[in-house]
Amino acid sequence: MKNAAVACSLAGVFALAAILGSSSGRAAESSSLQEHHLRLYHTHTGERIDIVYRRGDQYIPEAEAQLDHFLRDHRTGDVKHYDPHVFDILSDLAAAVGHPSAEIEIICGYRTPWSNEFLRSRSAGVAKNSQHMMAHAIDIRIPGVDTLALRNAALALGRGGVGYYPRSQFVHVDTGRVRAWCYGCSSLHTNTE
């Protein structure tokens, strides 16, 4: 009788473990299939893209290629492979400001060295070794979101560089080292990266 009770108890424990294991397996499977989505509008080309770029922790190569083309140097047409973590910053930033499905306006994506030098010759706010030339940076704004609030949300993420350009109404985000600057602000330092 005692052996039967122990066997019954063990069977119950194994059944509970199987149930818990399958439900946690489903949760893991669900999170591994979570889709990460971006809606972007390029202010210089007029192009739009609405794309799932990552499922779970796996970036989608075809989506990356489409985003690389979308973010090409609009002056030369040159394309460079983007650091996909920039896409995560955009997605997380839109969520952080309460607009997870917002269409993000792209002011500038990839820049060739030629384009970067062209811009540097016209503005002191363009860095000589810009992260844009490595396809690690994007300049953005989100319609309906104050750019100062967008900058503050980007700073709160604590990932990479955050530049604030209040006169031009955009925020720069990149995957370089963590740092911040403001071009055209009197209260923040004005170094450019």
Predicted regions, residues:
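Catalytic cores and adjacent binding grooves of peptidoglycan-active enzymes
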Residues: 36-41, 122-193
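Bacterial N-terminal signal peptides
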Residues: 9-19
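Extracytoplasmic/secreted envelope proteins and their assembly/folding machinery
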Residues: 64, 87-94, 116, 120, ...
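Acidic helix-start/capping segments at beta-turn-to-alpha-helix junctions
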Residues: 102-118
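Active-site acidic/histidine clusters and adjacent loop/turn architecture
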Residues: 55-107
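Mature N-terminal segment immediately following signal peptide/propeptide cleavage
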Residues: 36-54
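Loop/turn elements at helix/coil->beta-strand transitions in domains of secreted/extracellular proteins
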Residues: 47, 99-104, 158-161
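Sec/Tat signal peptide C-region and signal peptidase I cleavage site
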Residues: 23-29
